[in-house]
Structure formats: C-alpha cells, structure tokens
C-alpha cells in the first residue's frame, strides 16, 4: 500500500497588504467582485463598485485599518501566521500552508507550497467555524479553479465547518470564563456573528442555523440561562435586509433599557481582525456606553492560543 503524505491548508478571508487607500482598494475590488460575496447582476454591480464604492470606501476603510494595524501587518495576517506556525510546531511531520481567498498569500500559492513538499493529500481547513456560501463556499470555488489547472491533483479532504466541535466549544467556554473571572460576570453575554444577506439564508445557506448551534452549545457548556446569552449579527453592507437582530441596534436598545454590563464575543472569527478589534471592541462599545450602558468588554478571538491550536490539530487528524 502506497504511503500517503498529507499537508494542511489553513484558509481565511484575507486582508489588504497595507493600511493605505490604494492597498485597500485592491483588496476590496477582489473581495467584492466574488459572486459568492455579492451576487448582484454584473451589469448593475460593476459601475456601482468601480465608480462609487471603491473610490468612497477605500480611504475611509484604510483609516480604520490604520487604527488597528500591528507591527507585523494587519491583525488577521499576524494571528493567521501565528496559527500556521503553531500548528506546524504541533504537527512537525506535516507541512502546513496558509492561503487567503483574497489578497496574499493566495490559496493558489498555498496549494503550490504544499505540492512542492510532495504531498499527495491536502486537508483543507477553512477557518470559519460556521459554514456560509460566502466564506467556505468561496474557498471551495477557488480551490476547484486552482486544481482545474493541474495535470495531477492531490486527494482533498475539505472540512465544511466545526460549529459544534467539542474542542472548539470548550475553547470558547474557557475564554469566556477567563473574561468573567477578570471583569466579573456581566448582565448579558452577547455573541456577535458576521452577518449575511437574509436572501442567502432564504435560498438555502444554513449559516444562521450553524450560528444558533454554536450559541446553544456554548451556553450549555457555560451553564448559563438562555436569557443571559444573546445572538446578533454584525457588519451588514448595502441596502437589502441582512440576518437579524443587528449587533449595533441591539446594543443601543440594551443600553437604553438599563442593561449595565455586557461582554461581547465573536465566535465566528477564528482570528481577530478589523471587524472585531475596531467594529466590535471600539465602535459598538461607544454605541452601548452612549446609550446608557456602564461596562463593556470584548472577549478576544481564540487566535493562536494553545487550546485553539490543539483543536485544529484534533480536527484535521480525523481527515488524515
């Protein structure tokens, strides 16, 4: 029987190369051109994207990136590299590559890196705990395009998601417990997930169900009463309805109703990024406190913590 050599491909969304309008424009153009992300008619979308959205949004988004930029790059890139390196140390006999759907390093460069290591089987782990067509589906599409250009393709194991994985839920629960121990138990734990258009869910994307699964399992692991855990959706874009309730509107409502202390976690983000460090930790903190809230803490993503890396190692082991 032929010996198989397995490699691991960690996939995530991507990030601009620099906190500048030019770099952000390049990144947003690639990201917002993907039909998995925006499936509007190209005849309508292209003029809007190129003539309005990119010129207006790029300078503003670049300033937001600059506010969270780290010495080694964007937070997503820094933490993703740390995850790759830590998993490679945990699995020293297994090549581990990092690829992004948009920007650098690309998914194609990650596949080529693994093939250069003479692997004949790749375990693809999209770092999106809850499946969505706009994230995991985009990785699948790009991987298929990459392999379509190869004369010889490796065996592929593709991990769809891990919304209810035991190690993942335990890692989240331990992170919440540590935050409660540090800041005191809040009146409410708010779990904020990235939103998608409601239409995508209506057409069959089971993302909201996967988010509810994670929320239910995490609340159970924490032994918290259902009324003390709330699920919301953030980062909506455009005019059509997205999954509700919206995070910012919910925080405003809670502050106005007299809820004093809230802690917020984003279980759908495997690594901290602009949407967690700026939108949730800063913007939404101001929303809650401005509406009358008293205490607000953001619970960081799992990033490259030992528990998270162990979870990844155990997850890919089942597919090797």
Swiss-Prot record:
<keyword id="KW-0408">Iron</keyword>
<dbReference type="InterPro" id="IPR019772">
    <property type="entry name" value="Ferrochelatase_AS"/>
</dbReference>
<comment type="similarity">
    <text>Belongs to the ferrochelatase family.</text>
</comment>
<dbReference type="GO" id="GO:0006783">
    <property type="term" value="P:heme biosynthetic process"/>
</dbReference>
<feature type="binding site">
    <location>
        <position position="194"/>
    </location>
    <ligand>
        <name>Fe cation</name>
    </ligand>
</feature>
<feature type="binding site">
    <location>
        <position position="275"/>
    </location>
    <ligand>
        <name>Fe cation</name>
    </ligand>
</feature>
<keyword id="KW-0456">Lyase</keyword>
<keyword id="KW-0627">Porphyrin biosynthesis</keyword>
<dbReference type="InterPro" id="IPR033644">
    <property type="entry name" value="Ferrochelatase_C"/>
</dbReference>
<keyword id="KW-0963">Cytoplasm</keyword>
<keyword id="KW-0479">Metal-binding</keyword>
<dbReference type="Pfam" id="PF00762">
    <property type="entry name" value="Ferrochelatase"/>
</dbReference>
<dbReference type="InterPro" id="IPR033659">
    <property type="entry name" value="Ferrochelatase_N"/>
</dbReference>
<dbReference type="GO" id="GO:0004325">
    <property type="term" value="F:ferrochelatase activity"/>
</dbReference>
<protein>
    <recommendedName>
        <fullName>Ferrochelatase</fullName>
        <ecNumber>4.98.1.1</ecNumber>
    </recommendedName>
</protein>
<comment type="subunit">
    <text>Monomer.</text>
</comment>
<dbReference type="InterPro" id="IPR001015">
    <property type="entry name" value="Ferrochelatase"/>
</dbReference>
<comment type="pathway">
    <text>Porphyrin-containing compound metabolism; protoheme biosynthesis; protoheme from protoporphyrin-IX: step 1/1.</text>
</comment>
<dbReference type="GO" id="GO:0046872">
    <property type="term" value="F:metal ion binding"/>
</dbReference>
<dbReference type="GO" id="GO:0005737">
    <property type="term" value="C:cytoplasm"/>
</dbReference>
<comment type="function">
    <text>Catalyzes the ferrous insertion into protoporphyrin IX.</text>
</comment>
<keyword id="KW-0350">Heme biosynthesis</keyword>
């Amino acid at each position: 029987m032929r010996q198989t050599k397995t490699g691991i491909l960690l996939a995530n969304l991507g990030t601009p190369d620099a906190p500048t309008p030019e770099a952000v424009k390049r990144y947003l153009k690639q990201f917002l051109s993907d039909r998995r992300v925006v499936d509007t008619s190209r005849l309508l979308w292209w003029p809007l994207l190129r003539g309005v959205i990119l010129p207006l949004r790029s300078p503003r988004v670049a300033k937001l990136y600059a506010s969270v930029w780290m010495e080694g790059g964007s937070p997503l890139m820094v933490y993703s590299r740390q995850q790759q390196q830590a998993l490679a140390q945990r699995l020293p006999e297994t090549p581990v590559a990092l690829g992004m759907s948009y920007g650098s390093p690309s998914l194609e460069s990650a596949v080529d890196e693994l093939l250069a290591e003479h692997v004949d089987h790749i375990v693809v782990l999209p770092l999106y705990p809850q499946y969505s067509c706009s994230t995991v589906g985009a990785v699948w599409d790009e991987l298929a395009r990459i392999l379509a250009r190869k004369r010889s393709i490796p065996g592929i194991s593709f991990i769809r998601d891990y919304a209810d994985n035991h190690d993942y839920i335990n890692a989240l629960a331990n992170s919440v417990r540590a935050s409660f121990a540090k800041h005191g138990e809040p009146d409410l734990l708010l779990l904020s997930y990235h939103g998608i258009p409601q239409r995508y869910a209506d057409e069959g994307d089971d993302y909201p169900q996967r988010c509810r699964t994670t929320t239910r399992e995490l609340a159970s692991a924490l032994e918290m009463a259902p009324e003390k855990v709330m699920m919301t959706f953030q980062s909506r874009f455009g005019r059509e309805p997205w999954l509700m309730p919206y995070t910012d509107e919910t925080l405003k409502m809670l502050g106005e109703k007299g809820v004093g202390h809230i802690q917020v976690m984003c279980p759908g983000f495997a690594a901290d990024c602009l949407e967690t460090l700026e939108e949730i930790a800063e913007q939404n903190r101001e929303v809650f406190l401005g509406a009358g809230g008293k205490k607000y803490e953001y619970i960081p993503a799992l990033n490259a913590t030992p528990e998270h890396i162990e979870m990844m190692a155990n997850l890919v082991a089942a597919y090797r």
